[in-house]
Amino acid sequence: MKLRDLAGVLPVEGTASADLEVTGISSDSRQVKPGVVFFALAGTKADGAAYAADAARRGALAVVAGKSNSVAGLPVPVLTVDDPRLALALSAARYFGKQPRTMVAVTGTSGKTSVAAFTRQIWEQAGYAAASIGTTGVVAPGRNEYGSLTTPDPVALHQLLRELADAGVTYASMEASSHGLDQRRLDGVKLAAGGFTNLGRDHMDYHPTVEDYHRAKLRLFDTLLPKGAPAVIFADDPWSAPTIQAAQAAGLNVLTVGRHGDFLTLKRVEHERHRQRAEVEAEGVLYEIDLPLAGDFQISNALVSAGLAISTGTPVAKALAALEKLKGAPGRLDLVGTTVSGAPVYVDYAHKPDALENVLASVRPFTTGRVMVVFGCGGDRDRGKRPIMGEIATRLADVVIVTDDNPRSEVPETIRAAILAAAPGAIEIGDRRKAIHEAVGMLHAGDTLIVAGKGHEEGQTIGSETLHFSDHEEVRAALRERAA
């Protein structure tokens, strides 16, 4: 590709370098090699304009900067654009050029990882070569890689989509985080459909209000999806109505799912210990589904996934039958084991108020004894959610143990105190390993334990150091000790 091939995205007309070969796209000056186009992005911690000279020294073909950036005196062309992040995403899409032919994205506060994984599984069972991209990484035929970002940066994303397409993947589902949408990471992805799960308090360290957070989510529907594309929206959330209105205003084909859904209507559900039996109406036909996952929220996630699969061509009967073979996403109400007396221990990623409320409420119907929870809140993040989560835990669980969960640069005792202020009767055990072992030791027949916060993650960040720590490993170790 030559620089002139990015015309329409970048102002390359008349540039001396227009006929030179582009060898790459980057927003990290350390990755610049001769022929790479460098994008100077303004970030929260650093401004890419400060690294433009370094990029030029490393051989950048051109530097792309915003109109407000002071980038001058470089020995390479400086291309000025209104929105450097948008230009980066669109340039990356054009540079890498290919993606799976059917792409869907799902947004919401909770459930994105599960919906992306479930949609992939439905497609797989329908016989399609499918992939999912999100918080737990990339899963595709012959590929299972862990990742740390919900929505990868545009260069990594479009490179990945090219690799998946080259490997024969034709269907792909991905998570669309509010950060990713706001920072234009998904722009340039050709989406066939979009999904919405729910909205609750999250990322208040990034978004000034919940309304601003919701507006960021809506970019999926009012900006990224083409007119007429399916928008599969869970209908039973307080934020469903404004999301439906926005999608309709954008000219999308709104398909609602859930108890109040029109496209897939949940008529009845019966909870069992590790599974649920549901009746779902679709196109006037009633389907009985035996979902091998616990929790109301998993029914909701499964319906959004089925809606995405059906709206992109999977037959209704095949999609709903596939729900009976779903496997939960790693760290999402993940049954790690049971005690000798049969008490189950789950690990869940719930680190937000709504997610904690959902997971605790979901195990109550099949718990004959006590619901117990071990959780904490992260440091250097939304401080306002700490007492909210403390209140939720004490309201919905019978035994609450407050512990540490990535305190980062904050004093751990201060974080715990903020939670405990709204959690009368909660037990404080700062050491997360000890907290898990103590909780497992307290279990009796009929009890259920949730270890919340980390899910699939395998680290505990204290200060600037991340130490290896796995809730799964600690639960298994505690269960072995008690069984000995």
UniProtKB/Swiss-Prot annotation:
It is found in: Cytoplasm. Its EC number is 6.3.2.13. Disulfide bonds: none annotated. The modification N6-carboxylysine is found at residue 217. Meso-2,6-diaminopimelate binds at residues 381, 405-408, 453, 457. ATP binds at residues 108-114. Carboxylation is probably crucial for Mg(2+) binding and, consequently, for the gamma-phosphate positioning of ATP. One of its GO terms (biological process) is cell wall organization. Its main location: cytoplasm. It catalyses: UDP-N-acetyl-alpha-D-muramoyl-L-alanyl-D-glutamate + meso-2,6-diaminopimelate + ATP = UDP-N-acetyl-alpha-D-muramoyl-L-alanyl-gamma-D-glutamyl-meso-2,6-diaminopimelate + ADP + phosphate + H(+). Keywords: ATP-binding, Cell cycle, Cell division, Cell shape, Cell wall biogenesis/degradation, Cytoplasm, Ligase, Magnesium, Nucleotide-binding, Peptidoglycan synthesis. One of its GO terms (cellular component) is cytoplasm. UDP-N-acetyl-alpha-D-muramoyl-L-alanyl-D-glutamate binds at residues 29, 150-151, 177, 183, 185. Pathway: Cell wall biogenesis; peptidoglycan biosynthesis. It comes from the Bacteria. InterPro entries: Mur-like_cat_sf (IPR036565), Mur_ligase_C (IPR004101), Mur_ligase_C_dom_sf (IPR036615), Mur_ligase_cen (IPR013221), Mur_ligase_N (IPR000713), MurE/MurF_N (IPR035911), UDP-N-AcMur-Glu-dNH2Pim_ligase (IPR005761). A motif (Meso-diaminopimelate recognition motif) lies at residues 405-408. GO terms for molecular function: ATP binding; magnesium ion binding; UDP-N-acetylmuramoylalanyl-D-glutamate-2,6-diaminopimelate ligase activity. Its cofactor is Mg(2+). Pfam families: Mur_ligase, Mur_ligase_C, Mur_ligase_M. Belongs to the MurCDEF family. MurE subfamily. Catalyzes the addition of meso-diaminopimelic acid to the nucleotide precursor UDP-N-acetylmuramoyl-L-alanyl-D-glutamate (UMAG) in the biosynthesis of bacterial cell-wall peptidoglycan. This is UDP-N-acetylmuramoyl-L-alanyl-D-glutamate--2,6-diaminopimelate ligase. It comes from Mesorhizobium japonicum (strain LMG 29417 / CECT 9101 / MAFF 303099).
